[in-house]
């Protein structure tokens, strides 16, 4: 199972740049989507971290607060090889407060502490803001045009390479290699590795369907029976008739075309869209059978990713680019449409 063959929206970029040469080349800030109210039994911490993975920092916060690890939550994991500003939640009923400036974890600083009346849960993020410095960029005639095109028309909403892992740092293989063992009948007993392998397998199949849709020339062209995702939530509906209203809603980004996240049961699509999706997944019967047997439900994911508030500027021969993305999407999927990314060997991200 390979991950380097998926189609570009246009052609492969000519420009090349070095990605994440140092942590502050990749700055991520969470966008929570709501404001903590200032009271309640949960303490929300706004933390800047560098060179730390999210789970490790959660452990250190729990130790400092003398609380069980289950009392500390976060909305999403952030790359170890970055400068990240993210929220942590600490369940601490009562009036007692902490001097968070005394949290002595090299690479971490608590910027703000405020109470809220609800637990910070995984998946509540509205999105993330990325500020990325690509170093030693080789210029090309179409670089500015590519950036403008991505800003206007979006990028394929591929799962990024982080989802599939890297076998260089695990002698037993990457997430995708573990997934291959799983579909061939091997039992993965480590719960965390099993979960990552399942996620990688499902993501890989989604990327396959998306890539084939681009290859067929139907990335932006709705098919009869397409499943449309509503912007900003997980709701969707089947469009059996591609009329002017549907086309207008697609143009205004009120809805987007989706592709399947495989699970048990029947595909939600109908007609031409159903025929297309079946034509792709039928080539991977072991994968579909494995995912269905795990009890996962059929779900959908938009095929297009729209970066918002995109800005860029040259800094000598480096390119600084900033944009915001919805939660659950990958900055690398935007970057790959603009230039060839050469990642520095920094080790595993989590």
UniProtKB/Swiss-Prot annotation:
Reactions it catalyzes: uridine(13) in tRNA = pseudouridine(13) in tRNA
TRUD domain sequence ranges: 154-306
EC number annotated for this UniProt entry: 5.4.99.27
CDD domains: PseudoU_synth_EcTruD
GO cellular component entries: cytosol
Top-tier EC class: isomerase
Family: Belongs to the pseudouridine synthase TruD family.
The protein's name in its UniProt record: tRNA pseudouridine synthase D
Protein's organism: Pseudoalteromonas atlantica (strain T6c / ATCC BAA-1087)
Lineage of origin: Bacteria, Pseudomonadati, Pseudomonadota, Gammaproteobacteria, Alteromonadales
Gene: truD
């Amino acid at each position: 199972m390979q991950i380097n063959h998926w189609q570009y929206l246009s052609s492969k970029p000519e420009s090349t740049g070095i990605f994440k040469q140092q942590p502050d080349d990749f700055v991520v800030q969470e966008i929570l989507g709501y404001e903590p109210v200032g009271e309640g039994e949960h303490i929300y911490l706004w933390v800047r971290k560098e060179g730390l993975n999210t789970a490790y920092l959660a452990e250190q916060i729990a130790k400092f607060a003398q609380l069980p690890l289950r009392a500390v939550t976060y909305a999403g994991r952030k790359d170890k090889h970055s400068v990240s500003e993210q929220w942590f939640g600490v369940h601490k009923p009562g009036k007692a407060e902490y001097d968070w400036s005394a949290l002595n974890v090299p690479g971490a600083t608590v910027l703000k502490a405020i109470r809220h009346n609800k637990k910070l849960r995984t998946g509540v993020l509205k999105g993330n803001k990325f500020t990325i410095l690509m170093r030693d960029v080789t210029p090309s005639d179409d670089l500015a045009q590519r950036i403008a095109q991505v800003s206007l028309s979006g990028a394929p909403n591929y799962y990024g390479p982080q989802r599939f892992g890297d076998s260089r740092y695990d002698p037993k293989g990457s997430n995708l290699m573990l997934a291959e063992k799983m579909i061939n009948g091997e039992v993965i007993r480590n719960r965390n590795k099993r979960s990552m392998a399942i996620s990688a397998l499902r993501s890989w199949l989604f990327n396959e369907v998306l890539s084939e849709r681009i290859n067929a020339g139907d990335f932006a062209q709705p098919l009869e029976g397409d499943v449309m995702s509503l912007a900003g939530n997980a709701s969707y509906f089947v469009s059996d008739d591609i009329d002017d209203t549907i086309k207008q809603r697609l143009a205004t980004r009120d809805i987007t075309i989706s592709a399947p996240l495989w699970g048990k049961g029947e595909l939600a699509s109908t007609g031409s869209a159903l025929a297309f999706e079946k034509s792709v997944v039928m080539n991977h019967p072991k994968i579909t059978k494995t995912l269905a047997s795990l009890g996962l439900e059929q779900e959908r994911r938009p095929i297009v990713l729209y970066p918002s508030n995109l800005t860029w500027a040259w800094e000598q021969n480096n390119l600084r680019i900033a944009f915001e993305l919805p939660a659950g999407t990958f900055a690398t999927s935007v970057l790959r449409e603009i230039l060839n990314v050469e990642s520095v060997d920094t080790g595993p991200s989590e």
